[in-house]
Amino acid sequence: HLVTTGTYSCPDGFPDILAQYRAEDYKIDQEYRNFYYEYDQLEDTEAFERLRDLVENIYTNEYLDKLLPKWNAGLQEEDSLTKLPVQIDFYAHNIRNARERTVVIISDAMRYEVGQELFRLLSDDPKCTAKLETQLSVLPSYTRLGMAALLPHKQITMTDDYQVLVDDVLCDNLAGRQNVLQKHLSNSICVQFDDIKGLKKN
């Protein structure tokens, strides 16, 4: 996919850009990530530096340089935010009315292409029913703001020094996010992955 990206063509208009990305273009990001994963496993990279430079040149100049200007222009279209569910509505659409126990796993910088790979792996498990959906993240795409957007809220604000407040509660750490969540769902908890990983199985 990265080599064929040398002839990459990006459509015009936000709906068509989204459709092409979900159908095909995510594979470019996926292969780019896989390439660097394998490259970083090498003890001696000298023999592969020209290949790395080629991959980087194609990815940056033939793919991103064509995609990003049209993506940014698409976001300026009057109805662009109606083309996808938005991250800021995540709780209202997915959690508020859930009847069963729900676990939300948050991973920093988990792009659609990673989700697509996880979806494929889960779909291969006969005990699992997997579904993949897309959402448009908050802008700016800032980790603390993104995590806050997943919480129940009436308003989210960011201070001049980039502190994120959810309904006037500071949410710059796990305790702050749990405080907000428990105001809406008292029987809920926020935990770090490492704390769960360290638990012993009973």
What are these regions (language model features)?
Residues H1-T102, A109-N202:
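…; additionally, a secondary subgroup of soluble metalloenzymes is captured
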